[in-house]
Amino acid sequence: KVLKYKVMIDPLTQKLDSEQYNWLMRYGYIDASINTNIIKLKETKEMLWSHIKKGHKHNIKQGRKYCKVAVWDYSNPDYEKHELYRLMHHKVSGRITRSLKTFELQYDWLKNDEAILIGLFFDNKWIAFGCFVHLNKKAIYSSSVQNPEELDISVPLGHLMIWTAIEYYNNREFDLLEIG
C-alpha cells in the first residue's frame, strides 16, 4: 500500500505564464509549488537591464567599480580557481559541508560545457564565487560563496554575479536562467 508519493515538475521544463503549470492537481495531488525567479534571456541586454530594480542596478555598478569579474567555462577551465571556490566554502562555513566528489562533479560539468564559475577579485584576492549549471539552453544559479573576512567593501556581490551570468547566457543565446 502506497502512503505517500512525491512528484516534482521542474519549472524550467514548463511553459512560462501557463495556467497549466501544475497539472497534477487535476488528479488530486497537493500543490506544493516552489517559489522561484526565472529570467527570460531572449531579449536584448538593454531590455534585460531595464527589468532590474534601481537598487540592484546600483549594487551591480558598485560591484563593477570595485571588483574584477572573471568567468570560467568549458573554453578556459581553471582547476586552481575551482579549488579556491571549494576551499572558500569550507572556510566560510567552518566545516566541510559536502563531499569533495560534489566539487569534482562541478568541475567536470565546467569542462564539459554544463556549468560556469564566476569569480570576483578585489584587493589582490578572490572574495566571491558563484556556480551556474546549464543544459538545453536553460541555466540554474547553483551555488555561491563570499568570504566576509576578505571584504573591505560594503557592496552586495550576489547581484553582480547574477548579472554577469545573465550577460554570459544571453550572449550564448540561452532561453532561461533560474535564480531561485
Model segments located where?
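Conserved GNAT acetyl-CoA-binding A-motif
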Residues: V2-L12, Y169-G180
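A conserved beta-strand-loop-helix scaffold within acyl/acetyltransferase catalytic domains
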Residues: D10-I153
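A short, hydrophobic secondary-structure junction motif
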Residues: A32-S33, A165-Y169
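Structured catalytic/translocation cores of nucleotide/phosphate-coupled proteins
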Residues: N76-Y79, L120, M161, I166, ...
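Conserved acetyl-CoA-binding loop-helix of GNAT-fold acetyltransferases
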Residues: K1, D152-E167
